[in-house]
């Protein structure tokens, strides 16, 4: 046997264990399939618990989804009498509503008190009929129907209440920027009159990126 034949034979000998070991992955494949099924069930369980417009969740700071950015609206409720209500539709700037077909994935609401705040308020984001005038009676009915999960914000002696944010996931609804006028922030001042300078609401609307101007205005 010459040198080339010896080398070829050596290669074949090295390959045989690899070919012979191919029966082993059948067991590994079965284990992998079981693991995949378990992960699939876990994902379904987690998906069921993800926040929606009807079942929001408390959140900390989160990064935007890839390809998305956010537009913030700041609301300062006027004076609200004890046991009364306030509502404001989500009206985005014209520079954003120009792209009304861009999808909206999430709405986050943050409640920040000003120094004078010493009350309890209920806050929610709710889809409201276009015909609604957001009167006290209309808002009261929406809080009373049980379909409006709320963030209860109370006076915190030091700093800001730990759970001061709610996140609403709209991705399954395929909502877009044009739909945002159908949503409103609703506030209920439960125990005390809320003064004009007591509370600030920050509404962050996460939506698909829109073109931005590269030229400064004149």
Curated annotation (Swiss-Prot):
It comes from the Viruses. Residues 11-21 have a biased composition (Basic residues). One of its GO terms (cellular component) is viral nucleocapsid. The keyword Cell inner membrane does not apply. It is found in: Virion. Capsid protein. Probably binds RNA and plays a role in packaging. The N-terminal arginine-rich stretch does not seem to be the major RNA-binding region that allows formation of an infectious ribonucleoprotein complex. This is Capsid protein. It comes from Cucumber mosaic virus (strain O) (CMV). The lineage of its organism: Viruses, Riboviria, Orthornavirae, Kitrinoviricota, Alsuviricetes.
């Amino acid at each position: 046997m010459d040198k080339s034949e010896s080398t070829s034979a050596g290669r074949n000998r090295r390959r045989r264990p690899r070919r012979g070991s191919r029966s082993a992955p059948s067991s590994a494949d079965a284990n992998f399939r079981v693991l995949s099924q378990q992960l699939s069930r876990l994902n379904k369980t987690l998906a069921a618990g993800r926040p929606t417009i009807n079942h929001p969740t408390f959140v900390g700071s989160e990064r935007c989804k890839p390809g998305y950015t956010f537009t913030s609206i700041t609301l300062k409720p006027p004076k609200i009498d004890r046991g009364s209500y306030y509502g404001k539709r989500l009206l985005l700037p014209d520079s954003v509503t120009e792209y009304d077909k861009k999808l909206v994935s999430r709405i986050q609401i943050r409640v920040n008190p000003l120094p004078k705040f010493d009350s309890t308020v209920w806050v929610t984001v709710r889809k409201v009929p276009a015909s609604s005038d957001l009167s006290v009676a209309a808002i009261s009915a929406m809080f009373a129907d049980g379909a409006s999960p709320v963030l209860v914000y109370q006076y915190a002696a030091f700093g800001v209440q730990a759970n001061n944010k709610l996140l609403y996931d709209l991705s399954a609804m395929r909502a877009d920027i044009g739909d945002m006028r159908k949503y409103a922030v609703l506030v209920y001042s439960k125990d005390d009159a809320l003064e004009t300078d007591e509370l600030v609401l920050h509404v962050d609307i996460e939506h698909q990126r829109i073109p931005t101007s590269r030229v400064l205005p004149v």
